[in-house]
């Protein structure tokens, strides 16, 4: 597929063949597939399929080099990995080949829980059950209270948002009933109006809060296990300035809870203090408030990305300064 194709249009084209993309950002209506590969990492589908850089998702790239005499390259999966999540720093992607999945008639299920411990525990049980999920989002009530009206009444409770295969709905209902949580089965996911559960998840959660108050921002992190210990310690210190939003993911094949907490902006120092606090509690923070690829990722230089930039963009003209390990 050409990299400028909107993911919305690509999904429609795949539907004709009974297929679907494995991973979507919450911005899938306006995002291009090339932009997602270059700057995305995961999203809807990560509870099944992990992250974009996991082997098996990106099968190949067509790339134009930024040289005095540009070359058109066809990169197989192994070579293409260096350009995956590199923010366009080491080659101009013109087309790509991705793995897809069999299409599933995902069912939207909302579960409300009276306390946070129950909500987190239920998410873990759902994610570890023998059911197919495409989304498992967990939101504290302070977020639910600020979601758009079409998302349903807030009820003052913490909420799970689930996309479940049809044969798994009864299992989710049974698990929820066992902890006295309230279940609403909304039916098959319809993505025509922009008001489905996926539009409440991942980065759209932050976008909805920013519609209320632009001082809300966010962080990204992988929580240490057991997750509640870390979350409770941070909540005690930061209070209402930190509101938890969790997404179930597969990390190297294992079920984990990633966190995209919304954070009230109190200045750069306060944000850095919070990041330091999270790290002290054992969380691995992927800081979205920094310039470089390395700073927002694992914090180390990726030698393969740098080597690809030297091959494809020796003068450093593509997205200059973004790849911290490169010097022309």
How should each PLM-predicted stretch be described?
Residues 28, 181-328:
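Conserved glycine-rich FAD pyrophosphate-binding loop
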Residues 1, 107-112, 152-174, 217-222, ...:
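Short cationic amphipathic helices and targeting signals
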């Amino acid at each position: 597929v050409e990299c400028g194709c909107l993911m919305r249009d690509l999904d429609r084209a795949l539907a004709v063949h009974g297929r679907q993309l494995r991973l979507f950002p919450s911005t899938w209506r306006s995002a291009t597939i090339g932009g997602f590969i270059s700057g995305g990492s995961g999203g809807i589908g990560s509870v099944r399929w992990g992250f974009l850089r996991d082997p098996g998702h990106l099968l190949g790239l067509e790339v134009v080099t930024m040289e005095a005499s540009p070359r058109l390259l066809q990169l197989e999966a192994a070579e293409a990995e260096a350009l995956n999540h590199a923010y366009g720093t080491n080659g101009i992607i013109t087309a790509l080949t991705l793995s897809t999945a069999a299409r599933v008639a995902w069912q939207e299920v909302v579960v409300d829980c009276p306390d946070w411990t129950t909500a987190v525990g239920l998410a873990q049980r759902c994610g570890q059950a023998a059911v197919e999920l495409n989304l498992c989002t967990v939101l504290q009530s302070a977020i639910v209270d600020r979601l758009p009206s079409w998302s349903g009444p807030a009820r003052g409770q913490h909420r799970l948002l689930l996309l479940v295969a049809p044969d798994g709905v009864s299992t989710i209902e049974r698990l929820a009933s066992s902890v006295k949580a309230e279940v609403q089965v909304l039916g098959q996911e319809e993505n025509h109006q922009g008001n489905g559960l996926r539009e409440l998840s991942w980065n759209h959660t932050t976008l909805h809060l920013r519609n209320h108050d632009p001082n809300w921002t966010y962080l990204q992190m992988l929580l240490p296990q057991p997750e509640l210990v870390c979350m409770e310690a941070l909540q005690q210190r930061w209070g209402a300035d930190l509101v938890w939003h969790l997404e179930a993911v597969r990390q190297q094949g294992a079920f984990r809870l990633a966190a995209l907490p919304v954070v009230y902006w109190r200045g750069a120092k306060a944000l850095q203090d919070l990041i330091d606090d999270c790290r002290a509690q054992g969380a691995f923070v992927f800081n979205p408030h920094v310039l470089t690829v390395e700073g927002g990722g694992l914090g180390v230089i990726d030698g393969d990305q740098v080597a690809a930039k030297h091959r494809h963009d020796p003068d450093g003209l593509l997205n200059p300064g973004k790849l911290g390990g490169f010097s022309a």
